[in-house]
């Protein structure tokens, strides 16, 4: 049974989130399987609006879910103490040196390109996937179809999970391959997956069978999936992997000629949108437009720690700067539009994990040292719309239901 309580909120409950999901694109996602279930799963209830929430894990592995509509909190159980987490907007993948624990928040959105479907099911902890070393996790834009990739650096094991099985409460590996230990990625792309390790990327069918020839990718790091395809960051470029005529296609997007700015090693966006952001350490923010196949460098006056491309009509780009502030940049010029007060200075000083996420209307930020979660209206002067003081310190969190 879920135990619900109300967190302390520092603004009136009338300031509730009215978040809308992203704008429709004219074509279907290139990297998703063709089978269309509208995200429906047996036992799930379809909703009239997204059931948005903040699902968090504290330092002891206790999992909580804050409902952003009624501000109640549910205790979802306990996983092993996390070292890192990843989320696709439904599941949280909590990694430590022994494997990955999977939490199903029970809320998700199905993007049908020209409209959306919203669902709620039972929230639960699904179990663990064993592996050596803190895994990197890669997901697609679907929480009910396709695959989820895990790469364990200690053993060099590349694992692809069946995401449809996850949506039914089961953990099923469709392949587990072994390459050289070290950094790596397993990136789902439709019914295929890319394994990035060493200095190359290989493509595989869902059963692990190699497909085609390897593609060079020096020092692979960072991945994200947009409506256009799956992105893998390389030292000199990004690889864009899409599925055309039921076959994977790899396209290289090189950094601009003559650029001396550091490459991006992580990417973030409003889920599914074609433009993604990455930090060019010490230089600013890289924007990668996967639809236009272009990079743009936005120089910044403040050192940037994280960057998120909202990719909305106003081309908003959100950054977390070294002073703990959230700043709103013009994605076309790099000009600063607004800035919050420093919110997470204590967490940054303590070396604690802080994460900035965004949807179409709001941004969210955790402060483990401050014991706070913030909702920020980035279109209204980076105003703090709501501030929550959860009972458990939010060491890691994700916005779920989107």
Task: Give, region by region, the residue ranges found by the protein language model.
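C-terminal motif of bacterial Sec signal peptides marking the signal peptidase cleavage site
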Residues: 19-22
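Bacterial signal peptide processing site
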Residues: 24-27
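A short beta-strand motif characteristic of beta-propeller blades
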Residues: 69-77, 111-133, 167-178, 207-215, ...
């Amino acid at each position: 049974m879920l135990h619900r309580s109300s967190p302390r909120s520092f603004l009136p409950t009338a300031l509730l989130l009215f978040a809308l999901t992203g704008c429709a694109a004219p074509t279907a996602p290139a990297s998703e399987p063709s089978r269309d279930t509208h995200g429906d799963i047996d036992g799930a209830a379809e909703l009239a609006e997204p059931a948005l929430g903040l699902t968090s894990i504290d330092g002891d592995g206790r999992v909580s879910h804050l409902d952003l509509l009624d501000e109640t909190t549910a205790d979802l159980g306990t996983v092993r103490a996390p070292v890192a987490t990843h989320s696709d907007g439904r599941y949280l993948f909590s990694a430590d040196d022994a494997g990955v624990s999977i939490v199903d928040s029970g809320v998700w959105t199905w993007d049908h390109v020209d409209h959306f479907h919203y669902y709620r099911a039972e929230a639960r902890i699904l179990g663990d996937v064993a592996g050596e070393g803190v895994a990197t996790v890669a997901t697609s834009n679907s929480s009910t179809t396709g695959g989820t990739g895990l790469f364990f650096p200690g053993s060099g094991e590349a694992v692809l999970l069946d995401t449809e099985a996850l949506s039914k409460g089961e953990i099923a590996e469709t392949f587990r391959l072994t390459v050289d230990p070290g950094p790596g990625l397993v990136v789902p792309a439709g019914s295929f997956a890319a394994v990035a390790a060493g200095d190359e990327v290989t493509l595989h069918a869902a059963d692990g069978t190699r497909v085609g020839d390897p593609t060079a990718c020096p020092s692979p790091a960072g991945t994200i999936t947009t409506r256009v395809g799956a992105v893998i960051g390389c030292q000199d470029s990004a690889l864009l992997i899409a599925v055309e005529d039921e076959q994977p296609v790899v396209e290289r997007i090189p950094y601009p000629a003559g650029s001396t700015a550091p490459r991006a090693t992580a990417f973030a966006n409003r889920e599914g949108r074609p433009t993604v952001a990455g930090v060019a350490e010490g230089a600013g923010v890289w924007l990668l437009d996967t639809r236009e196949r272009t990079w743009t460098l936005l120089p910044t006056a403040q050192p940037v720690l994280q960057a998120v491309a909202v990719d909305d009509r106003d081309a908003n780009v959100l950054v977390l700067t070294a002073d703990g502030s959230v700043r709103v940049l013009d994605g076309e010029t790099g000009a600063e539009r607004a800035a919050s007060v420093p919110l997470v200075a204590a967490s940054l000083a303590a070396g604690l994990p802080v994460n900035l996420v965004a949807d179409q209307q709001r941004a969210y930020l955790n402060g483990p040292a401050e014991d706070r979660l913030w909702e920020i209206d980035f279109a209204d002067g980076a105003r703090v719309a709501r501030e929550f003081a959860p009972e458990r310190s939010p060491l890691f969190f994700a916005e779920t239901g989107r």
